[in-house]
Amino acid sequence: MSSKKKTKPVLPPGPVMVDVAGTTLTKDEKRRLRNPLVGGVILFARNFTDRRQLCALTRAIHKARKEPLLIAVDHEGGRVQRFRDDGFTALPPMQELGKLWDRDPLAAMRLATEAGYVLAAELRACGVDLSFTPVLDLDYGVSKVIGNRAFHHDARVVTMLSRALTQGLALAGMAACGKHFPGHGFVGADSHHEIPVDPRPLARILKDDAAPYAWLGDLVMPAVMPAHVIYPKVDAQPAGFSRRWVSEILRERLGYDGVVFSDDLTMEGASVAGDILARAEAALGAGCDMVLVCRPDLADELLDRLQVQHPAASVERIRRLLPRFAAPDWDTLQNDSRYQHARRLQSQIVSG
């Protein structure tokens, strides 16, 4: 009788990113993560009680497959920061950096880089690979869901500050994901609960809102997330389900070759595409590399029904998002002078 230990098969990252319910993995979740269609896990505030628990959870997720799954989180600063206690730095809303730009552009650039570094260094010390940041939407003073998450109303300022922030992310070994292509800032409706409609023509959107994506490209911004917003003068489908937006405009016209994530397919803004299978098929058919499904019951339904061959190009793009070097643990990070300085700067801008 053979005594050889069974080895896990090497599965490439699949096209579906799922969530987990709590602070540890259940048996059902471990089974779900072994599904070949799964390529990543998104974490939320409910998955965090303290750093020790978070590190244990991310280790368990990474160990679920021989080729580790991508672990992501929405951790932008301001009101969208999933981990807030047990040593995590309170990061400013990005609008504060835009206000600083109006007074002192160089200081704003420096602080943006330091914000990106602190954000990424702390997440990576706890085993998180990617934050869905920065927000590239322009601040028109209309969208409550975007609001102070946006850097500025000027596309040039948004581009410069987001570039500086991504440099900070890169210093800690983390990639960036710009959102929400081609722009969510012009509409008041919240795509979590409604289906926003932006009536502007394509030329206006490309000139203003989409300009940061064109200027930054995939070398600076290796991932992008489209908006669950309908632009009827361009396509009847929300951008994330639109081949015109993802394949023709983003990939071909703007020459973008990074990862395209769908936004959460369980949001109300995605309901126009149909049930969960129809939503996933529409997003992948439009050119997305990975779809987010942030409800376990719908994730299981999708994994049971979805039949798709993940393109080799998508697999390679997703692999490029994984960190390229090991991160220092939390205690080592706390003793790093660069980190200490960057953290003090964030505290100053948060406290005003």
From Swiss-Prot:
What the entry lists under InterPro entries is as follows:
Beta_hexosaminidase_bac (IPR022956), Glyco_hydro_3_AS (IPR019800), Glyco_hydro_3_N (IPR001764), Glyco_hydro_3_N_sf (IPR036962), Glycoside_hydrolase_SF (IPR017853), NagZ_Beta-hexosaminidase (IPR050226)
Q: In which pathway does it act?
A: Cell wall biogenesis; peptidoglycan recycling
Q: Which reaction does it catalyse?
A: Hydrolysis of terminal non-reducing N-acetyl-D-hexosamine residues in N-acetyl-beta-D-hexosaminides
Q: What class of enzyme is it?
A: hydrolase
Q: Where are the transmembrane segments?
A: none
**Its principal location?**
cytoplasm
| An annotated Gene Ontology molecular function | beta-N-acetylhexosaminidase activity
* Alphabetized NCBIfam families for the sequence: PRK05337.1
User: Which protein are we looking at?
Assistant: Beta-hexosaminidase
Natural source organism: Bordetella pertussis (strain Tohama I / ATCC BAA-589 / NCTC 13251)
Lineage, highest ranks first: Bacteria, Pseudomonadati, Pseudomonadota, Betaproteobacteria, Burkholderiales
